Regions:
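Short acidic, Gly/Ser-rich segments with clustered Asp/Glu that frequently serve as metal-coordination loops
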Residues: 12-18
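Glycine/Thr-rich phosphate-binding loops of Rossmann-like dinucleotide-binding domains
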Residues: 17, 50-51
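Short hydrophobic beta-strand that contains or immediately precedes a catalytic carboxylate
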Residues: 8-9
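Von Willebrand factor
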Residues: 33-49
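Catalytic metal-binding/acid-base residues of hydrolase active sites
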Residues: 12, 46-47, 107, 133
């Protein structure tokens, strides 16, 4: 399934503490992706705005959370919400013929949302792993899952992912 990638977004020390509730599932998704030879890609947010304190490059807050399994060196940084704003990431997807992306990480109401929208707009098949995402405001998760579906993304659980339901070929 070389045309598919698991994209892990913004699981960094400055992200919401709610990541602890999904980290086991995210790591299980990473294990499965490795076993099935999907690309595993990590996206990190860098906050370049003056006066902000979170996600500052070179700080502990900008580092990936220590519990996250890192199995590849396919790491890209972004300064805006959508992962596709990183031209190297977009080029990587193109160069490797990746057409299906499975998203995990945070924040469901910000960077995951923006990445989903922009990837769909760019013609990618986007699959959100519903039990591998979180948000600062967890009450927004049902609304975000409905939003993703309304934009043409499939919303699937980790179990459905592992069983191959909805996996891009």
């Amino acid at each position: 399934m070389k045309n598919s990638a698991l994209v892990v977004i913004d699981l960094q020390n400055d992200i919401t503490k709610h990541y602890r509730e999904i980290i086991e599932n995210v790591n299980a998704a990473i294990d499965w992706a490795v076993e099935k030879e999907l690309w595993v890609i990590y996206i990190q947010h860098n906050n370049l705005s003056a006066g902000t304190r979170t996600f500052k490059p070179g700080t502990r807050g900008a580092e990936l959370v220590p519990e996250l399994k890192v199995v590849s060196d396919h790491m890209f940084t972004k300064a805006k919400s959508s992962a596709l704003t990183n031209e190297s990431f977009a080029a990587f997807l193109q160069e490797h013929g990746i057409t299906h992306c499975y998203l995990a990480g945070a924040d469901a109401a910000a960077c995951i949302k923006s990445t989903c929208f922009n990837m769909r707009k760019s013609g990618y098949a986007v699959h959100v792993l519903s039990d591998c995402i979180t948000s600062y405001d967890k009450k927004k998760l049902p609304e975000m899952l409905a939003y993703y579906a309304s934009k043409g993304c499939s919303v699937t659980t980790l179990q459905e992912f592992v069983e191959g339901i909805g996996i891009g070929r």
